From Swiss-Prot:
Chief localisation class: endoplasmic reticulum
Pathway: Sphingolipid metabolism
Record organism: Drosophila melanogaster (Fruit fly)
Residue ranges the record marks as coiled coil: none
Protein name: Sphingolipid delta(4)-desaturase DES1
Catalytic activities: an N-acylsphinganine + 2 Fe(II)-[cytochrome b5] + O2 + 2 H(+) = an N-acylsphing-4-enine + 2 Fe(III)-[cytochrome b5] + 2 H2O; an N-acyleicosasphinganine + 2 Fe(II)-[cytochrome b5] + O2 + 2 H(+) = an N-acyleicosasphing-4-enine + 2 Fe(III)-[cytochrome b5] + 2 H2O
Endpoints of the signal sequence: none
Presence of the UniProt keyword ATP-binding in the record: no
Keyword entries, A-Z: Endoplasmic reticulum, Lipid metabolism, Membrane, Mitochondrion, Oxidoreductase, Transmembrane, Transmembrane helix
Taxonomic lineage of the native organism: Eukaryota, Metazoa, Ecdysozoa, Arthropoda, Hexapoda
PANTHER family in the cross-refs: SPHINGOLIPID DELTA 4 DESATURASE/C-4 HYDROXYLASE PROTEIN DES2, SPHINGOLIPID DELTA(4)-DESATURASE DES1
Amino acid sequence: MGQKVSRTDFEWVYTEEPHASRRKIILEKYPQIKKLFGHDPNFKWVAGAMVLTQILALFVVKDLSWSWLIVAAYCFGGIINHSLMLAVHEISHNLAFGHSRPMHNRILGFICNLPIGLPMSISFKKYHLEHHRYQGDEAIDTDIPTLLEARLFDTTFGKFLWVCLQPFFYIFRPLIINPKPPTRLEIINTVVQLTFNALIVYFLGWKPLAYLLIGSILAMGLHPVAGHFISEHYMFAKGFETYSYYGPLNWITFNVGYHNEHHDFPAVPGSRLPEVKRIAKEFYDTMPQHTSWTRVLYDFIMDPAVGPYARVKRRQRGLAS
């Protein structure tokens, strides 16, 4: 089973999440950052091109053997699908069309969701915005592993399994920590997605649908692009609960690696986050940062000081506070 993790509890703190206060300080010093706020007019074309690429790929993978289909799903389709998940992340902040056109953002979210295979764009928005506002809250922030996860996967091999099973924890954890009734848009999202899936099976067979689903699942687990799930908020350095990564994988993930910058300024689209760092570099260069998402996965699994417990948590303060 391997070495047991050294932590036996989460890192409980009694301070506010750090991003709102740092945002205020940075804007006082660099008010020009406000000019970076707003939607990215090029985003919809990039996201749309990825969706089209996956749809065209379906006509190729339908004739592949199952072994080559899995290789294609891991090495190609899964990367695009993971990037589309991060497109959904951008859309959840209304960064595709701006806050004045919410339904345009939701519809693009439905479209970006199609190759992913599982309806998630509306549900993701519902929980993700709370992750920003209530970062670390024990009863609201569903990005934090449950106590059961932390206790079960507390060895080297256990952490390896946990990384492989990450997509399932991301799907089911919100239903345990902070269940919410489905909204009308979630139902529409589900109907649209299931209809798309059914059309794939009807016209092309089961293999293309399997290619999409397998790619989505594999690229959320033991995969280099999935390293951002762990790199963003797992405590690799005591006292720091958010980390940035500035490496080349940002090019295919809408700069999600600029995670301190994103949490400080969620109204800035991913394409402009490097400019935030350039302007306010003294705030970001001094914080711990990751240089490789693959190394993050390796260190998470092999380092006994890191594991599901390595998260900052706060006692519940309630949605009304």
